[in-house]
């Protein structure tokens, strides 16, 4: 049983404790008129969902309020993953499951039972197309969600009385219903071919003549591929009916070891794409693996960054700059509703920055989920309708450095009363404001040579070495960091962290940007894309990391055959 299944069982068990006696004695009772309209839908899942939704419109406990909004969302998730270590296949898994989320809102659009966390009941749904089985799950989940919503509404009304100022924003924005039934997506990957690639790639440390000489320094070598095909079904009492989906694939290599002083080092690399065919070819994957192994050995032999703290210019590659924006910028323009009783606009760092400058004037940022490709590469964050049934919109977030818009779902925030099509949901989770395809663009961008010349000019002007970073790891830790002398000589260093790389750095520290946009696709719970160019910061701190060095292995690794 996978982790998601276990988690869902826990959620279902916990929420079932709250449910009281079921409202209906049998699921066989139907509304004939509603059933006839739902029967026109060809998809058996949508038809069953619509039939049960029509039936649940009569949901009412004696003396209690009737729901003003009910939504059924079913995620049909097919996944595949294969992993190889040290030249042998170690894991291969295929999984198919369906997860249902039922949302019931009590009250009205102005004030309802919802909270900033998002409410709903989650249950596993049958994986076949048995309509009666699905309707039973919908029935019990709706009953539970309704009772939970009644309790939440009562508690919220009591809480609102404690605040002196009245609530200024609606809890839920009204939208026009939309009907769109898109083709079902499926996993499409040559599994045997990829298993062969993974086995070969994970064993290259011991077989390729270019890297075999330092194989004893490689403590792990892992290659993996994974794919997901998610079809999302949604119906609600406003009349929206959707079936839409996406596919995503990643092929990656991860190698690691230790330097002679015990410092742990790694190189993690790969490609992410909307289709398996867009992933790297077998030859490119092999080449990348060898390059990563060589890079790991170079890191092992590289000096530790100077113990003297540094403040000065750092040139970030497009890859690294995209990671910086993913971490520091994007979450803060996704306008999630704050807790009750607060005057904040959103929960992010830019809550009070509306109409203020948050980036240099030369930079503008747009989120355009409707763009599906860039320079021939598929964009994972693209979509046409969000997960709340609102058509996607291109949003100019930052215009010449000034914050002009937030990304908004159907839960309004101050100054933004309607959705701009950015309500997106992870499987089984409530929808929140999330980005789609972020474009960071610069006025008068510089070429790579011009950026390097600008960096060296700053080094000469300040009379000291400067830095350039190619890739970042988690927490924005530099993975490939080079010290650059004023004459242009580069030296790889290790063991560094950035100091004070934060939103203030984005606002005031970027002095130039390149004409080399890098596409960063993220195959997370909500697929997203960020496209950003190289960026030159004029004042970033670089210092030696405070790390507890690990002991080296006590004895040598197994001898390679033929060595």
What are the language-model segments listed below?
Residues 1, 30-31:
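Intrinsic-disorder/low-complexity regions
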Residues 4, 15, 33-34:
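Intrinsic disorder/low-complexity detector
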